[in-house]
C-alpha cells in the first residue's frame, strides 16, 4: 500500500508539473485532493485497516497530502507569474519606435492676423500694452475727451456692467493707463478684445482690436501717414493703394479714416466695396490736446498720433470672407482652410 501511495504521489506531481494553465492545475487538484479525489478516497478507506495500519498509512497519506498541497501552491504561483509576464509582454511598448502621427492644430485665422499685426509693429519698436476688459466709464470715455453729455457716446453702443462700469468698447483706455504711468516718449500698440452690442454680417458683440499710440516731440501727421502706408502694404501687399479721408473722433484732432483700394475688384467697383472701389480699413488722427492734459502731458511740448483697427475686419479683407460670424462658429471645414 505504501508503494501505491508513492505511485499516486509521483503521478500527481508529474501532472502538477505538466499543468500549464490555472484551469489545468485546478483540474489536477480536484482529481487528487477534491472530495472525490484519489488521495481523499484512500484516506476514507483507512477505516477498513487495523489500528496499527491506520497509524502507518494514515500518517504517510497526510504527509503526501501536505506535500501535494504545497506543490499545488508553488505551481499556482509560477503559473500566475508566467501569466502576468505574458500579459506584460503583450502590452509592452517599444519606446524607441516613432509615435503615432496626429493632425496638427493651427492658430485661428483671427489669431494669425493678430499675431502678424503685432509682429509688424514690434519689429519697428512698438511695445505691446494690455489692460482690463472691464473698464470704468472714466477710462473708456471721459479721459478720451468723451464726457457724459457728449454726443460722441451715441457713436457706439455699450455694455454696462454697472452705472460707471462697462465692457470696454475699444482698447483706447490702455493708452490712457500707459500715459498715466509713463513719461514720453510712448510707442505702444494695445491689442485685445472689445465689446459692443451689435451683431450682423459685419459686426459681432465681441471682436478684436489693435490700437496704436506714438507720443514724442515733433510728431506730425506725416509720420502717421508714413507708418500706416508701410503697415498696410506689409499686410495686403506692395501694390496696396491708400487714401485718407477727413473724419471725426473725439480723442484725435485732426482725424482721418483710412481706406485701401478694394482688394477684391482692384478699384473697379464690386459688391464688397459697395461699387466705390475703396474699403474702409481703420481710423486715425493726431492725439487731441485735451487727452494729453488728462494724463498730465504738456500739449505744447508733445504731440502724437493714434490709430485703431479691427482685426476681424483685416482678416475678412485678407482672406475674402464676407460674414464675420464665420470666425466664431467653430466650423472645422472653415477653420481648416487657414
Swiss-Prot record:
Localization of this protein: Cytoplasm
Chaperone is among the record's keywords: no
Record: residues binding Mg(2+): 253
Cellular component terms per the entry's GO annotation: cytoplasm
Keyword tags: Aminoacyl-tRNA synthetase, ATP-binding, Cytoplasm, Ligase, Magnesium, Metal-binding, Nucleotide-binding, Protein biosynthesis
Catalyzed reaction equations: tRNA(Phe) + L-phenylalanine + ATP = L-phenylalanyl-tRNA(Phe) + AMP + diphosphate + H(+)
Family, per entry: Belongs to the class-II aminoacyl-tRNA synthetase family. Phe-tRNA synthetase alpha subunit type 1 subfamily.
PANTHER family membership: PHENYLALANINE--TRNA LIGASE, MITOCHONDRIAL, PHENYLALANYL-TRNA SYNTHETASE
Record note on quaternary structure: Tetramer of two alpha and two beta subunits.
The name this protein goes by in its record: Phenylalanine--tRNA ligase alpha subunit
Organism: Syntrophus aciditrophicus (strain SB)
Amino acid at each position: 500500500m505504501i508503494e501505491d501511495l508513492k505511485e499516486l504521489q509521483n503521478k500527481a506531481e508529474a501532472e502538477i508539473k505538466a499543468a500549464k494553465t490555472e484551469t489545468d492545475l485546478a483540474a489536477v487538484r480536484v482529481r487528487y485532493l477534491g472530495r472525490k479525489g484519489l488521495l481523499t478516497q484512500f484516506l476514507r478507506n483507512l477505516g477498513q485497516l487495523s489500528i496499527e495500519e491506520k497509524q502507518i498509512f494514515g500518517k504517510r497519506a497526510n504527509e503526501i497530502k501536505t506535500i501535494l498541497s504545497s506543490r499545488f501552491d508553488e505551481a499556482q504561483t509560477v503559473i500566475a507569474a508566467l501569466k502576468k509576464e505574458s500579459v506584460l509582454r503583450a502590452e509592452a511598448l517599444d519606446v524607441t519606435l516613432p509615435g503615432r502621427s496626429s493632425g496638427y492644430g493651427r492658430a485661428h485665422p483671427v489669431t494669425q492676423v493678430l499675431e502678424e499685426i503685432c509682429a509688424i509693429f514690434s519689429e519697428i519698436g512698438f511695445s505691446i500694452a494690455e489692460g482690463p476688459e472691464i473698464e470704468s466709464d472714466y477710462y473708456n470715455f471721459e479721459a478720451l475727451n468723451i464726457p457724459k453729455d457728449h454726443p460722441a457716446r451715441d457713436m457706439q453702443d455699450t455694455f454696462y456692467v454697472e452705472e460707471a462700469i462697462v465692457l470696454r468698447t475699444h482698447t483706447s483706455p490702455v493708452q490712457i493707463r500707459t500715459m498715466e504711468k509713463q513719461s514720453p516718449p510712448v510707442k505702444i500698440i494695445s491689442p485685445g478684445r472689445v465689446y459692443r452690442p451689435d451683431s450682423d454680417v459685419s459686426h459681432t458683440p465681441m471682436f478684436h482690436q489693435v490700437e496704436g499710440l506714438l507720443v514724442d516731440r515733433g510728431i506730425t501727421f506725416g509720420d502717421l501717414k508714413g507708418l500706416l502706408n508701410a503697415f498696410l502694404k506689409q499686410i495686403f501687399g506692395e501694390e496696396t493703394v491708400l487714401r485718407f479721408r477727413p473724419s471725426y473722433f473725439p480723442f484725435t484732432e485732426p482725424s482721418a479714416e483710412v481706406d485701401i483700394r478694394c482688394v477684391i475688384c482692384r478699384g473697379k467697383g464690386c459688391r464688397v466695396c459697395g461699387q466705390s472701389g475703396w474699403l474702409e480699413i481703420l481710423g486715425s488722427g493726431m492725439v487731441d490736446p485735451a487727452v494729453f492734459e488728462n494724463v498730465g502731458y504738456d500739449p505744447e511740448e508733445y504731440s502724437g498720433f493714434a490709430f485703431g483697427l479691427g482685426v476681424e475686419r483685416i482678416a475678412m479683407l485678407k482672406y475674402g470672407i464676407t460674414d464675420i460670424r464665420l470666425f466664431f462658429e467653430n466650423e472645422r471645414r472653415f477653420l481648416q482652410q487657414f
